Amino acid sequence: MFRNQYDNDVTVWSPQGRIHQIEYAMEAVKQGSATVGLKSKTHAVLVALKRAQSELAAHQKKILHVDNHIGISIAGLTADARLLCNFMRQECLDSRFVFDRPLPVSRLVSLIGSKTQIPTQRYGRRPYGVGLLIAGYDDMGPHVFQTCPSANYFDCRAMSIGARSQSARTYLERHMSEFMQCNLDELVKHGLRALRETLPAEQDLTTKNVSIGIVGKDLEFTIYDDDDVSPFLDGLEERPQRKAQPSQAADEPAEKADEPMEH
């Protein structure tokens, strides 16, 4: 992307009716590591790919606990996600103290949409550079919502965001009809297979780089990390080998894809 006279502030429209600062924020989501969300009739599942800043650093948390019935996975700027997560936790606490009931998932997503819309309209502010997948369970059943830096939000049956997420969305679209009838183990496996599609051919899912969040009927939101992920990965079949492109010469190394930013 190249700078132009219409991207100096979020309040400036281009002649084509675009707000470039918002588009730049949405590009930040595409640079974050991939995450997948999907649901059945009884459960909602989040599966996220964790990334370490360096070999000396621990892997960043990609799935965050909001309330007993809600959790989120993030792609983009972690600092922005932490701020939004704290806001969501406060709203859930307010609902429990004031109304003595858990906050409905759709209501919480609406509040997030209102909060993220404010920086897109005021001078001197910038949009939040993070996308969220929100999984929850309430009286209406399981939910998976996607939020964007543009303040749009969508109710989804399955969704993936982050780097190389198009490959995961292709898998989800291909198996969409199976999700509603799946039990919990099968649903998690579908999420892991979709997430695996975002990885380069030489990499695979491990207990170190995968995090899983599950919520559902009679099951509070639970995050599985490290060794807790092993039972789910053990039941996953080996990754099929991708065929080499016929047009690529055997003696020429494959071009290295652009590495996404560390988010």
Curated annotation (Swiss-Prot):
Q: Which GO terms describe its cellular component?
A: centrosome; cytoplasm; nucleoplasm; nucleus; proteasome complex; proteasome core complex; proteasome core complex, alpha-subunit complex
Region Disordered: what ranges? 232-263
Major site of localization recorded for this protein: cytoplasm
* Post-translational modification, as annotated: Proteolytically cleaved from a C-terminal extension in the course of the conversion of the proteasome from its latent form into its active form.
**InterPro entries the UniProt entry points to:** Ntn_hydrolases_N (IPR029055), Proteasome_alpha (IPR050115), Proteasome_alpha-type (IPR023332), Proteasome_alpha1 (IPR035144), Proteasome_asu_N (IPR000426), Proteasome_sua/b (IPR001353)
- Biological processes per GO annotation: immune system process; negative regulation of inflammatory response to antigenic stimulus; proteasome-mediated ubiquitin-dependent protein catabolic process
Q: Write out the function statement from the record.
A: Component of the 20S core proteasome complex involved in the proteolytic degradation of most intracellular proteins. This complex plays numerous essential roles within the cell by associating with different regulatory particles. Associated with two 19S regulatory particles, forms the 26S proteasome and thus participates in the ATP-dependent degradation of ubiquitinated proteins.
Name of the protein in its database record: Proteasome subunit alpha type-1
**Organism of derivation:** Rattus norvegicus
- Where can this protein be found? Cytoplasm; Nucleus
Which residues are reported to carry the modification Phosphoserine? 110, 177
Q: Name one GO molecular function term.
A: lipopolysaccharide binding
N-acetylmethionine carried by residues: 1
Q: Would you identify the family this protein belongs to, as annotated?
A: Belongs to the peptidase T1A family.
A single Pfam family, by name?
Answer: Proteasome
Q: How does it assemble?
A: The 26S proteasome consists of a 20S proteasome core and two 19S regulatory subunits. The 20S proteasome core is a barrel-shaped complex made of 28 subunits that are arranged in four stacked rings. The two outer rings are each formed by seven alpha subunits, and the two inner rings are formed by seven beta subunits. The proteolytic activity is exerted by three beta-subunits PSMB5, PSMB6 and PSMB7. Interacts with NOTCH3. Interacts with ZFAND1.
Q: Where is the composition biased (Basic and acidic residues)?
A: 253-263
